[in-house]
């Protein structure tokens, strides 16, 4: 057998949220991947249906129309924008460009699993900082950093805990990290947050040359199937990442549909309103049943159980009823489960089954 890179052997394969079995004839109730339950508006659907693309032609490699739209809406210079096949690809590109066997990639203990995978894939040294009350601990992150720390990944809000860092905490983190460390703020769930002391950090990033802010169309925009993420970066970082970014990495349909969705302000507003209502509803229902729910600002909740066994038994029992939620063993949270804010029908079905198992 041909041996792989040693760092690759350290990587635990990423396991996505379960989607059900192809053997089952009934449609699964999938609450495991934080997908949007909100349907596109008729106007957006009509625009999409009128989109006719020549499949024999490669897509625009620079996503120029979409880049222009994002530049206008978010008030950022188009030279600072880069696109990825999902945010994941951007995390890999950053790791490949800025890490090696002598340099560290830093992240919070219960941060998104792709961070350590990307760091290891780039032969970097993985370092994580302990959290406090399921929230990234700024002092611990700063303490764990040193002059070999080149990248710090931080999800804000965090997946899978749903907790967030305030504007002042992000600034404290940036000021406490080494000057040569790139702070990468993953704001995949930022649009769901309504807390006044929160920011997606774009405004702050524009004042500095050492911050990257990533965003995605997979969550509130409901485009998970088309894989599209983007990042605001210092111009030099964009130029560096483009050296190894795969050509034509964003398909033509993803580019066109994203442009249409960015114009649909009502869709975005409806998604936020829906999420706030049903997240509160689900949290209250689980609290009423005696479960501890960690306060979340995202489109999911994390439920903490008395033991890992209790959490696993509930998830396994729900699977038998074709309901899928997220076990968090790989996140070092084996006594917790993550549940997406799905459709009203799916959430009520989930609650009925949980009550039966009480």
Pin down the residues of each PLM region.
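Conserved PLP-binding catalytic core of the aspartate aminotransferase-like
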Residues: 276, 288-321, 337, 341
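Short acidic capping loops at alpha-helix termini that bridge into adjacent secondary structure
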Residues: 77-81, 101-104, 148, 180, ...
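Phosphate-binding glycine-rich loop
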Residues: 65-104
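PLP-dependent enzyme catalytic core of the Aspartate aminotransferase-like
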Residues: 168, 175, 309, 317-321, ...
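Active-site pre-lysine segment of PLP-dependent enzymes
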Residues: 120, 138-147, 160-183, 187-220
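N-terminal "arm"/small-domain region of PLP-dependent enzymes with the aminotransferase-like
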Residues: 1-57
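PLP-dependent aminotransferase-like
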Residues: 97-154
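PLP-dependent aminotransferase class I/II
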Residues: 62, 210-287, 291-294
